[in-house]
Design a protein with these regions (language model features):
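ANL superfamily adenylate-forming
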Residues: 6, 45-52, 56, 139-182, ...
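Conserved AMP-binding/adenylate-forming core of the ANL superfamily
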Residues: 18-20, 37-92, 96-100, 117-122, ...
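Conserved AMP-binding A3 loop
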Residues: 57-61, 186-210
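Structural core segment of the AMP-binding/adenylate-forming
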Residues: 76-77, 105-169, 495
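AMP-binding/adenylate-forming catalytic core of the ANL superfamily
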Residues: 116-123, 133-135, 276, 400, ...
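Adenylate-forming
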Residues: 135-145, 231, 257-259, 273-318, ...
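Conserved AMP-binding/adenylation subdomain of ANL enzymes
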Residues: 209-226, 234-275, 283, 289-290
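Conserved AMP-binding/adenylate-forming
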Residues: 269, 304, 311, 315-328, ...
Length: 550
């Protein structure tokens, strides 16, 4: 189980001044000493509707104290340095308290999506061997705690609703003999891969802080600003984009989840937010219906980040020329990809919408945090040769202080180049019209990108094949205006068998514990699936056939 960087890497990054001794919780202690009464975390006002718990507003000092008390309680239950704890919570203050509490203990937190069911939780247990799982009794009626107990068997499940009070000890001293290793794993996030199951991505404090500094540089964050986080606090977008910048700059973290557009727009105004992220479909809608935006007072708001799919140049133009708000385009991953297109490095809305600076590429210079330490290039995915000619697609490869060391329990084959660059699996090209920038072309693999959430098609293939009277089955992406891509189930019935309905397919996958957001939203029946000479389904051809049907 690879959970820690090599001594060689630690020495290299430390000597370069890119890694240090700060931890997530040491930053909190520093902030609490400087501004004890500044707000640190603010719950969404509809929290009671989500979990039944009251919405809270914690100062920096209160967050430091309750996270220390929570750490002591977890220690009394057997959690120690090096342990792994799965946490399945929505964006609420309890989740933030647990990040800091587990950081203080030196334990690794594995945050998971609240949509995940028994199928995914069982996999996490097998891969991670967690000491416990922490969740909530119900989320909008969904019995998360009971679902986890059913899936995990003898692994303890602790419920923040009525079993684990993370707010106890509000008046206790925050000081303690806390962990101080910035190179220890802080999180194990999860990402989908072509193996058909999510892969664990261990990341240390130093890796996360490198990403947080890069985001902070791009957003020009200042001390004491206020952030609104509408995305699940479980991956690069929210951890590298909100949690760590908030700790680095002593900022207030206002929470929101799941996306409720009227509430989100109201929070932006009422909480006097300076920075937020927003999904492209929402930004497009606001640009097309400016009256939705202009009914509010957003004078405090400076910057909005977005990404996951190409942005609209027209949207960027409306936000910047009419609304006076800067748009940043992010392209990242849990493994440590962090391409950022800003007003400074990509002034044109047309370029910023679809292109990203070639950070650290030979002959290309952009100002950034860790300038010269973050390097990117394009390799031929088959030969490994470096591609320097514009317009020739290849695999994006990344090297830098924010890049992880490798997947959990993985042999590393195909993950890194011989000289240590992470092979992203994403196809990019040097833009012929703007050779200082990359253009995203597609993906080397077949991952489905549903609204920024990447899904593994082979995982669903395996659950459909041999079931429901099917001779063959595979899923593929199809284009969707709002989410970018959705899932289509492509089936070949056994001879003389009736094809299943879409509802039957969805019910079957649900019975296997598959999360709702992974379920197919379209069904197509075929006489045979397109395959290559080795018998592998040609998913790109399959997608073309699906989309040709309208």
């Amino acid at each position: 189980m690879k959970m820690r960087s090599s001594d060689e890497r630690i020495a290299r990054e430390t000597a370069a001044g890119l890694w240090g001794t700060d931890t997530l919780h040491s930053l909190l202690a520093r902030n609490a000493a400087a501004t004890p009464d500044r707000e640190a975390v603010v719950d969404q006002p509809n929290k009671a509707e989500l979990t039944g718990a009251e919405a809270r507003r914690l100062t920096v000092q209160e967050l430091d104290r309750v996270s220390s008390a929570c750490a002591r309680e977890l220690a009394s239950r057997g959690i120690t340095a090096g342990d792994r704890v799965v946490v399945q919570l929505p964006n609420t203050s309890e989740l933030i308290v647990l990040y800091y509490a587990l950081s203080k203990l030196g334990a690794a937190m594995s945050p998971t999506a609240v949509q995940y069911g028994a199928h995914e939780l069982s996999h996490f247990k097998a891969a991670l061997a967690p000491k416990a799982l922490i969740t909530v009794t119900e989320l909008r009626g969904a019995p998360l705690a009971q679902q986890a107990r059913d899936a995990l068997g003898d692994t303890p499940v602790w419920d923040v609703t009525d079993d684990l009070d993370v707010y106890a000890g509000m008046d206790e001293d925050a000081a303690g003999d806390w962990a101080d290793d910035a190179n220890a794993p802080l999180t194990v996030a999860w990402t989908s891969g072509t193996t058909g199951t999510p892969k664990g991505v261990p990341r240390s404090h130093n890796m996360w802080l490198a990403q947080g500094r890069l985001t902070s540089y791009a957003g020009e964050f200042a001390d004491g600003e206020r952030f609104l986080s509408p995305f699940p606090m479980i991956n690069m977008a929210s951890l590298g984009g909100f949690l760590f910048p908030s700790a680095l700059h002593n900022c207030t973290l206002v929470l929101h989840h799941p996306l409720d557009i009227p509430l989100y727009l109201a929070q932006l105004q009422d909480e006097k937010i300076n920075y937020t992220l927003a999904p492209p479909p929402l930004l497009n809608r606001l640009a097309q219906q400016p009256e939705m935006w202009e009914q509010f007072d957003y004078s405090a708001l400076r910057v909005i980040g977005s990404g996951s799919v190409p942005l609209s140049p027209a949207m960027i133009d409306v936000f910047e020329s009419r609304f006076g708000k800067t748009i940043i385009n992010f392209y990242g991953s849990n493994e440590g990809i962090a391409l950022i297109s800003t007003r400074e490095n990509s002034p044109s809305p047309e370029h910023r919408a679809t292109l990203f600076p070639r950070l650290g590429a030979e002959g290309v210079n952009f100002k950034s945090y860790a300038e010269g330490a973050i390097r990117t290039r394009i390799n031929d995915p088959d030969t490994g040769e470096v591609i320097s000619e514009p317009g020739v697609p290849g695999e994006l490869c990344v090297f830098g202080p924010g890049v992880f060391d490798g997947y959990l329990d993985h042999d590393g084959e195909g993950v890194f180049t011989a000289d240590g660059y992470f092979r992203s699996g994403d196809l990019v090209e040097i833009c012929p019209e703007q050779p200082t920038h990359y253009r995203i072309v597609g993906r080397c693999k077949d991952i489905i990108n549903r609204g920024g959430v990447k899904l593994s098609p082979s995982e669903l293939d395996g659950l459909l094949e041999g079931a429901l009277g099917l001779a063959e089955a595979a899923v593929c992406a199809y284009a969707d205006e709002d989410l970018g891509e959705k899932v289509c189930a492509c089936v070949v019935p056994l001879e003389d068998a009736e094809p299943p309905t879409l509802e039957t397919v969805r019910e079957h996958l649900s019975s296997k514990g598959v999360a709702r957001f992974k379920l197919p939203e379209r069904l197509e029946v075929f006489a045979a699936l397109p395959r290559n000479p080795l018998g592998k389904v040609m998913r790109n051809v399959l997608r073309e056939q699906v989309e040709s049907r309208g």
